[in-house]
């Protein structure tokens, strides 16, 4: 079945104008559709599981603002709380009682967090936690994993996933080799490689940081024993274990990936969901480590808008919605139905596919599985994914515009939305086979 051609005239006009105003016409690279081809859409509004572009086309959305919209876009209770909060001001630049409330909720939920510091983005949280790892241990080196993305700070732009090329050197011009000299990399799910790095760098490694489920190199789950092995290795070598839960935090369970897998790190970074759609980040962990942070301790970190009342309000209301009984069971059922249907549709069209899901996070690769690390992820047929992405847009489904990004469901996605999405996949896979 051939899908009708969408009218995206206004999107094209706006994007053309944007390219003279902003680098590449966007405020974040993946939005430019470079890896999937075609013109990016310019959105006008979002509500629930849907997004509308400036030409009036409606889409079922599986990006969810790249993760925050777990309750659905513009949830009425979140909007109502924000409307009330904004009457009191948008930012105080001073302590705010709402910070206490959200901090208590995060500490109660996340096993590793005994104290928390709010910032304004996941990148900012990861930058701060890197400094904290070094300050606490007195060591400079850090281990990260190929394909894991921890924001755009210089130190982390090494084999960083999110479509960034993996060259073994800094992944962006402007990042000095001296800056990344202390960044050690290993393949995800490879404990032996981590053991080797510790052996080659005795008493020099401050810690290991990773996405407990990789979401920026597609969707890659930890193999049994991998997270547990990292926990043992870091303890053995006096290093810290850090989970970057910017994506997984409050998404795959109320306590994040660490609660889901039963492995407690020393420090955790968060973002996305805890801001309910507003800019936010956080890092937290053991009290003895967090007390290194200024003004309690000597490690300096600050932020003009950190802990602002609007982000705190949206975060509080979002977590209140998520802790209601049955929330994660519903998210799991929705996402499992979706990914099972996607794999069935690809197989019916004679296309190779592998993929999976955990709660409200999913992903697939257009190749034979298994995919256990970034090197194996690169076997996916990115060109065919681009064709799939365009075919799905024509049928009213908005997927991440990259073969190397996880997808997200929400409490707002209905059975009808899932079935409409799967029908679009059936038609699209048949079209591109």
Swiss-Prot record:
Protein's pathway: Porphyrin-containing compound metabolism; protoporphyrin-IX biosynthesis; 5-aminolevulinate from L-glutamyl-tRNA(Glu): step 2/2; Porphyrin-containing compound metabolism; chlorophyll biosynthesis
CDD domains: OAT_like
Lineage: Bacteria, Bacillati, Cyanobacteriota, Cyanophyceae, Synechococcales
Enzyme nomenclature, EC number: 5.4.3.8
BP-aspect Gene Ontology terms: chlorophyll biosynthetic process; protoporphyrinogen IX biosynthetic process
Gene responsible for this protein: hemL
Name of the featured protein: Glutamate-1-semialdehyde 2,1-aminomutase
Self-association state and partner proteins as the record states: Homodimer.
Subcellular location, record wording: Cytoplasm
Keyword Kinase: no
Cofactor (UniProt): pyridoxal 5'-phosphate
Family: Belongs to the class-III pyridoxal-phosphate-dependent aminotransferase family. HemL subfamily.
Positions bearing N6-(pyridoxal phosphate)lysine: 272
């Amino acid at each position: 079945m051939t899908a009708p051609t969408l009218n995206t005239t206004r999107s094209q006009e706006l994007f053309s104008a944007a390219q003279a105003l902003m680098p590449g016409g966007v405020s974040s690279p993946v939005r430019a559709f470079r890896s999937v081809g075609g013109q990016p859409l310019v959105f006008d509004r979002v509500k629930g599981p849907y997004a509308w572009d400036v030409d009036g086309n409606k889409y079922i959305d599986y990006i969810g603002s790249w993760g925050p919209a777990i309750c659905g876009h513009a949830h009425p209770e979140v909007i109502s709380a924000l409307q009330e909060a904004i009457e009191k001001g948008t930012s105080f630049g001073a302590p705010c009682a709402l910070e206490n409330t959200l901090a208590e909720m995060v500490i109660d939920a996340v096993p590793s967090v005994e104290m928390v510091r709010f910032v304004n983005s996941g990148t900012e949280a990861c930058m701060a936690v890197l400094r904290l790892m070094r300050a606490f241990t007195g060591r400079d080196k850090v281990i990260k994993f190929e394909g894991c993305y921890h924001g755009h700070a210089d130190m982390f732009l090494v084999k960083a996933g999110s479509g960034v090329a993996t060259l073994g050197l800094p992944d962006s011009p402007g990042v000095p080799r001296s800056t990344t000299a202390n960044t050690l990399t290993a393949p995800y799910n490879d404990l032996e490689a981590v053991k080797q790095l510790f052996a080659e760098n005795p008493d020099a490694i401050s810690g290991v940081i990773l996405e407990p489920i990789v979401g920026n190199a597609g969707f890659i789950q930890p193999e049994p024993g991998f997270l547990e092995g990292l926990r043992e290795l870091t303890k053995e070598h006096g290093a810290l274990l850090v989970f970057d839960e910017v994506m997984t935090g409050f998404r795959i369970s109320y306590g994040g990936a660490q609660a889901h897998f039963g492995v407690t790190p020393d420090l955790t970074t968060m973002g996305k969901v805890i801001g309910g759609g507003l800019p936010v980040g956080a890092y937290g962990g053991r009290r003895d480590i967090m007390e290194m942070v200024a003004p309690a301790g000597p490690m300096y970190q600050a932020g003009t808008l950190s802990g602002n009342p609007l982000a705190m309000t949206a975060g509080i209301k979002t977590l209140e919605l998520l802790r209601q009984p049955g929330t994660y069971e519903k998210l799991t059922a929705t996402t499992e139905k979706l990914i099972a249907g996607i794999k069935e549709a690809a197989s019916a069209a004679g296309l190779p596919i592998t993929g999976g899901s955990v709660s409200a996070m999913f992903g697939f690769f257009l190749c034979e599985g298994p995919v256990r690390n970034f090197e194996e992820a690169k076997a996916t047929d990115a060109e065919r994914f681009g064709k799939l992405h365009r075919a799905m847009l024509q049928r009213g489904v908005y997927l991440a515009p990259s073969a190397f990004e996880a997808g997200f469901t929400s409490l707002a996605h209905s059975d009808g939305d899932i079935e409409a999405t799967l029908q679009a996949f059936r038609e699209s896979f048949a079209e591109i086979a």
